């Protein structure tokens, strides 16, 4: 059964909700808009009439209807607006321009040092430069970071890998670029993108698990991202997995024995070096190439990591009870080597009633992190729960403005 992005109960959400729906689902008849968003046909007729007059949407071809006269489809006009998405890492910022239908129009990367004294002003200048270069109407900017965020609307960030503690990312960027800015954990941004354009259109409760430099998890329950009391839900990379003193590998969070310390990119390389599979300067691509050429020792490194990930993820399944799990991230390029350890470990660790939970592995491109960040903006029309606060409201104002 397909799920809509959600009912639109408040009047200020209706115009932008309709525009957003046409962006995520493409040309749609008025009756389908009413049904999907939980609106009356009269409301849809009146609001779409106004949106057509403003030049935001247009009538397209007619399609057959059930027993009545043909229904006219509605679609977006070309310049309805775009969102900017930025993914912040330890050495660069990836930025994309994304249309309402999720299409990435352009992408660029800037070198970046988050530990520098002027890190936030520098990030503001980078984004202001990209905003100034846009020819399209900007709806807002979404920012994804590898850490905890107090709320999308505020954007105060704790990210040890960026050397940020209570960093006022949201306020600083809003002052620098003069546009709505929403900030969230980078894996949560991928979950937001899945809600709009991917598996979330067919499922209302799911996990988005990322493997790569780190291990993360975006949790979606009843169509909404679960953030926890302080914005730190889903940090499964910091589940303790050690059994004895030798297992307590140091983690970037400052603790030891975390899942990420063992199966993140650095942990895989450490294990491979200790076993002599790769040299002292060997990297994850080196290990992956060895596995691809048939090196059984290299494949065993991935399989052991997969088994550890499977056991940890089974515990998350028992806690959240999702309909489906989506695996993505840089690490999925070598998933066939992870899977030999993951699948038996994962299934064996699940309760009988949960053993059939599907695990979907999605192909990965580098643009997906930043596209996910842009999805924070593009999800604003459906933000009936108020997750994005005033920033989402400002996006809706821009989306519904003539």
Swiss-Prot record:
The keyword Repressor applies. PANTHER family: BIFUNCTIONAL UDP-N-ACETYLGLUCOSAMINE 2-EPIMERASE_N-ACETYLMANNOSAMINE KINASE, ROK (REPRESSOR, ORF, KINASE) FAMILY. This is Cyclobis-(1-6)-alpha-nigerosyl repressor. GO terms for molecular function: DNA binding. The keyword DNA-binding applies. Keywords: Carbohydrate metabolism, DNA-binding, Repressor, Transcription, Transcription regulation. Transcriptional repressor of cyclobis-(1-6)-alpha-nigerosyl (CNN) degrading enzymes. It comes from the Bacteria. Belongs to the ROK (NagC/XylR) family. Residues 30-49 bind DNA.
